[in-house]
């Protein structure tokens, strides 16, 4: 009866529950997180943390702060296979990068390659190399491992490489993600897979590959879209909600600290800072969170 009633009732509420005939719904409320009174062994100096998406954007900024504060050794995981770049390219300013982009795209076209794809790999490689240099400059030990998080065997091998080359994984920060907003009817299977699989299945695969006895903490980086939705983000919202459910299960089943940060839009770095995303968000009067504030959280 309750199910039929819900289906026939006009309401903006999409998640409801019933307990002893009492209708319940999800609600957000402000709460102060109590400080931990005992140290967490997983974040002791020298512990190895695996950080997906940790070489670029928001997650890289957080990983640098996290690694420096606690003296962690970081295994940064990304989807980009690094290509050879000239050392001088890392020092180029915006104008220099623009000139380089034009030259390399022309050369790629002459070789019969997709110019945009060829440049994208170089662009990401430069960003990752710069990021690794920033980790090194702050005295943080960081190693980069390329990996397709949607392929279980590839993930298993990556985790094995991390544990062999760096050490047993004590903690995970799962920040990898992909977002491409568009109307629902324009969503494709490939786009859905690229959005949902790394964010949700990727963490499942990593958890399956790590030593359960050594793993002491799990952190997921999600988005407010995972709770409130977002324009053109049906798949992205689903991915982030799934992430929260998976991390919740980790906390219950493994009895270790595990949580998800559903981040607000960051300024300066991250998906929301892209011109096309920023334009849409600004139309709704959204205020962006400064980089320094986000890292402090």
Please give the residue ranges for each predicted region.
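4′-phosphopantetheine-dependent carrier domains
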Residues: 1-13, 19-23, 43-297
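A short, basic/flexible loop-to-alpha-helix module at the beginning of a structural domain
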Residues: 26-46
């Amino acid at each position: 009866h309750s199910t039929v009633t819900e289906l026939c009732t006009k309401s903006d509420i999409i998640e409801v529950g019933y307990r002893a005939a009492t209708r319940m719904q999800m609600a957000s409320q402000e709460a102060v997180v109590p400080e931990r009174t005992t140290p967490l062994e997983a974040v002791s100096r020298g512990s190895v943390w695996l950080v997906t998406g940790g070489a670029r954007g928001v997650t890289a900024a957080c990983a640098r702060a996290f690694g420096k504060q606690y003296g962690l050794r970081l295994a940064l995981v990304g989807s980009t296979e690094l290509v050879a770049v000239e050392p001088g390219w890392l020092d180029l300013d915006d104008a220099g990068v623009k000139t380089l982009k034009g030259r390399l795209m022309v050369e790629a076209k002459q070789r019969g390659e997709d110019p945009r794809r060829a440049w994208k790999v170089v662009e990401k490689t430069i960003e990752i190399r710069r990021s690794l240099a920033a980790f090194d400059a702050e005295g943080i030990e960081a190693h980069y491992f390329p990996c397709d998080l949607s392929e279980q065997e590839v993930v298993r091998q990556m985790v094995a490489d991390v544990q062999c080359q760096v050490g047993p994984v004590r903690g995970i920060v799962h920040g990898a993600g992909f977002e491409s907003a568009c109307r629902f009817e324009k969503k494709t299977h490939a786009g859905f897979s690229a959005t949902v699989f790394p964010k949700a299945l990727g963490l499942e695969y990593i958890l399956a590959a790590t030593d359960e006895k050594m793993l002491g903490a799990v952190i997921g980086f999600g988005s407010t879209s995972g709770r409130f939705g977002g324009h053109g983000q049906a798949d992205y919202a689903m991915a982030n909600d799934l992430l929260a459910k998976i991390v919740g299960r980790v906390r219950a089943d493994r009895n270790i600290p595990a949580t998800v940060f559903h981040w607000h839009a960051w300024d300066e770095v991250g998906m929301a800072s892209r011109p096309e995303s920023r334009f849409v968000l600004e139309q709704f009067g959204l205020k962006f969170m400064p980089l320094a504030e986000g890292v402090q959280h």
